[in-house]
Design a protein with these regions (language model features):
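N-terminal intrinsically disordered, cationic/polar leader segments
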Residues: 1-46, 50-109
Length: 109
């Protein structure tokens, strides 16, 4: 995910997301569909009006793209991310698990 930089904000989006070759297709209720390569994505924010399938989640997680679910105000309230050993989140989990007890206590204060 070295080159991923793009945050796709669909928190107020109304429409459908579909898995597509090498990316996802964004289909607004009115307008043309847009193909977004997952290689460019770091984070995708989706709101209450977005419809997506497990295949979209699989495509994003496979590419180590974080998918955050937002409430009606656009504030993230949950998420899905890859459990890959090579991802950013997995690296952070390993680093936190390897901390000494005093450092773990300091982290939570």
């Amino acid at each position: 995910m070295d080159g991923a930089w793009r945050v796709l904000d669909l928190s107020s989006f109304e429409g459908t997301l579909e898995s597509d070759r090498g990316g996802i297709s964004v289909h607004p209720e009115s307008g043309e569909a847009v193909h977004v390569p997952v290689a460019d994505l770091a984070i995708v924010l989706v709101g209450m009006g977005a419809k997506l399938s497990a295949s979209v989640m699989h495509r994003l997680c496979t590419a180590d793209v974080a998918l955050l679910f937002c409430d009606w105000r656009g504030i993230p309230e949950g998420g899905a991310y890859s459990w890959s050993e090579h991802g950013r989140v997995a690296a952070r989990h390993r680093a936190q698990a390897a901390m000494t007890l005093p450092r773990k206590k300091a982290l939570h204060n």
